[in-house]
Curated annotation (Swiss-Prot):
InterPro entries: FUC_metazoa-typ (IPR016286), Fucosidase_C (IPR031919), Glyco_hydro_29 (IPR000933), Glyco_hydro_29_CS (IPR018526), Glyco_hydro_b (IPR013780), Glycoside_hydrolase_SF (IPR017853). One of its GO terms (molecular function) is alpha-L-fucosidase activity. Keywords: Glycoprotein, Glycosidase, Hydrolase, Secreted, Signal. Pfam families: Alpha_L_fucos, Fucosidase_C. This is Alpha-L-fucosidase. It comes from Branchiostoma floridae (Florida lancelet). Glycans are attached at residues 156, 224, 362, 375. Its EC number is 3.2.1.51. It is found in: Secreted. One of its GO terms (biological process) is glycoside catabolic process. It catalyses: an alpha-L-fucoside + H2O = L-fucose + an alcohol. Belongs to the glycosyl hydrolase 29 family. It is an enzyme of class 3 (hydrolase). One of its GO terms (cellular component) is extracellular region.
Length: 449
């Protein structure tokens, strides 16, 4: 026992400590779980879920610089004169919010991590923050700790890593507006609200993803980002497992932080040198729930599997967003997409989880084919079934030990080498309901170069 304690102490002594500089912070290795996970679920939920119209930027579009007339017209048609955005908060009731049910749906999606909005740009906190009096989910609205309840449900009933989105700025916070007017020479908002809430969140809920946003107006020095990250990596309760993104100040995107997001819906289509994430949303027009959305506004399963394949092939993670309702429901169309992704991953997860990019990301001869690799296997994710029943791949080079199979299909597949480079694979002869999945099919090749 004494020896184990000594070894533990010695290990702690030799853990690197990171200085509050980008040169130092950028040297921190990304915890391995994140790259292995590949797929996560984003959830945008807040007071904006009450009007659930336009997007989660409803308040800004109504009262901010955008001043969109369609929002004004919506308010005139549906709410009395003098109605304020703050009046939506008591309507954020979450009476149907069942964290155990959410955890089950999220687990069924095949995702390996979830990122919940703790606070969006409106400033309403989904936990009882002592720095957001009467503008939080315990003092107002649901009168529940929405963050804490989901954190517990996820950890006790799933194998997902729990993460939190946090907006550094608030559109209309007087301290923030004063600092902005002072051209960031004062930091009253950062000290009294932004940093205080971040430390509170990490210490209370131990998120393994800290997904920062709302940083773009001010430099990282205003946000004290490097000091916070040094604490997060050195001394926080999640210092060994936490991952962060690149939204820590103006000009930081795609340059500094943990993994890169670069922009919303970032999907470069080519291999990147740095670990990255494609954060995108099933509703093509909004991150929050919209009551006016039509079926055509939602990405279908062909779209989603394609985006997953493209993203993972090029070394990224996919963070796919849904928007719960004001009363705490995951509506059927979102649930259907999540469960369908899970069914696809049950069959084809070997081509996604813990994979590495191969020497080629997509095929040179057959469009709609994306590659991943793991150990001695190369996976070709085939988005479109070939009309002829034969699939010719231009990149793989066969060898005497080459074998070809389809994930979820018991029998090996027949194949022949193509002169020069490539192989032609005979796809299974079967009806659509006999195939292992509906949307995309994975060819596993061993012994190819």
């Amino acid at each position: 026992m004494g020896l184990l304690l000594l070894l533990s102490l010695l290990s702690a002594c030799f853990q690197p400590r990171y200085a509050p500089t980008w040169d130092s912070l950028d040297q921190r290795p990304l915890p391995s779980w994140y790259d292995e996970a590949k797929f996560g679920i984003f959830m945008h939920w807040g007071v904006f879920s009450v009007p659930s119209f336009g997007s989660e930027w409803f308040w800004w579009d109504w009262k901010g610089a955008h001043d969109q007339n369609f929002i004004k017209d919506f308010m005139k048609r549906n709410y009395p004169p003098g109605f304020r955005y703050a009046d939506f908060a008591p309507m954020f009731t979450a009476e149907w919010y069942n964290p155990l049910q959410w955890a089950e749906v999220l687990q069924a999606s095949g995702a390996k991590y979830v990122v919940l909005t703790s606070k969006h740009h409106e400033g309403f906190t989904n936990w009882p923050s002592k720095y957001s009096w009467n503008w939080n989910s315990v003092d107002n609205g649901p009168h529940r700790d929405l963050v804490g309840e989901l954190a517990m449900a996820i950890r006790n009933n799933s194998d997902l890593h729990f993460g939190l989105y946090y907006s550094l700025f608030e559109w209309f916070h007087p301290l923030y507006l004063k600092d902005k007017q002072n051209k960031w020479t004062t930091q009253d908002y950062t000290k009294d609200v932004g940093l205080a809430e971040l430390y509170e969140l990490v210490n209370a809920y131990h998120p393994e993803v800290v997904w920062s946003d709302g940083d773009w107006e001010a430099p990282y020095t205003y946000w004290n980002s490097t000091n916070f990250l040094a604490w997060l990596y050195n001394d926080s309760p999640v210092k060994d497992t936490v991952v962060t993104n690149d939204r820590w100040g103006s000009g930081m995107l795609c340059h500094h932080g943990g993994y890169y997001t670069c922009s919303d819906r970032y999907n470069p289509g080519v291999l990147q040198k740095h670990k990255w994430e494609n954060c995108m949303t099933i509703d093509k027009k909004s991150w929050g729930f919209r009551r006016e959305a039509t079926l055509a506004d939602y990405l279908d399963m062909d779209d989603l599997v394609k985006i997953l394949a493209e993203t993972v092939s090029c070394g990224g993670n996919l963070l796919m967003n849904i928007g719960p309702t004001h009363d705490g429901r995951i509506v059927p169309i979102f649930e259907e997409r999540l469960r369908s992704m899970g069914k696809w991953l049950q069959v084809n997860g070997d081509a996604i989880y813990a994979t590495k990019p191969w020497r080629a990301q997509n095929d040179t001869r057959e469009s709609g084919v994306w590659y991943t690799s793991k150990n001695d296997s190369v996976y070709a994710i085939v988005l479109d079934w070939p009309n002829s029943g034969q699939l010719t791949l231009g990149v793989p080079r066969s060898s005497p030990t080459t074998t070809v199979t389809m994930l979820g299909w018991a029998a090996p597949l027949k194949w022949v080498a193509v002169s020069g480079s490539g192989i032609t694979v005979q796809m299974p002869t079967a009806s659509s309901n006999q195939l292992p999945c509906q949307w995309a099919w994975v060819i596993r090749m061993k012994g190819v170069m």
